[in-house]
Amino acid sequence: LIQYVANQTLDQDLARIAVAHCRTTRDCLVRPDGSTAHEGIFDTQSGQFLRQSTHQGLRADSVWARGLAWSLYGYSKMYALTDAVEFLHVSERNAEYWLHHLPADRVPYWDFHADLALPPPQGAQKESSAAAIAASGLLDLAGQTRLPDRAAAYRDTAIAMLDALVTPEYLALDTPGWEGILKHGVYHTAKGLGVDESVMWGEFFFVEALLKAVQQEEREGE
């Protein structure tokens, strides 16, 4: 958002802040394998990075699914706004982790390190909003990457996730009394808030991803 405003207003100070923020986030929260930490703790006086942390993930060293989806989507968007290849590479790294750690139905559990032998919400709890965010990001990334084989993999995975999300397991179309579009979203597992419910960001990015997929299909049919 900061970079978008910088582009619209030609405010170079805002652009500098946006780029610095993304670089700091990459350096402190994106791990070598492409996974992400939820939060970073900094010394408020010196600004020194202290450690990775989390409030909504399983552990500080785990991979909170929605956090990884935000990173994948966000760095793809930052590349689109700046044309800085360094941000494209971050999104690609996030995508590789995502693609290699999805379960069979392509919709992630709330944390990639969750113990699936345990029942929800701490264990095998799906997170549909993370899938929606990542699907939208992967569709963008497929058009940005310079690697044709990866473009196909990103696009195919995004479509597979959307295919899963429109099944009765996730789409609330035929669920009486359900006040939302997607089931099995998660806000905050540790606090028991918005667990296995519809969440507004899940709805937004689900519709966004569907529109991108439809528009892509229309372009290919021309």
Please state what every model-predicted region is.
Residues 1-222:
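Glycan-recognition and catalytic cores of secretory/periplasmic carbohydrate-active enzymes
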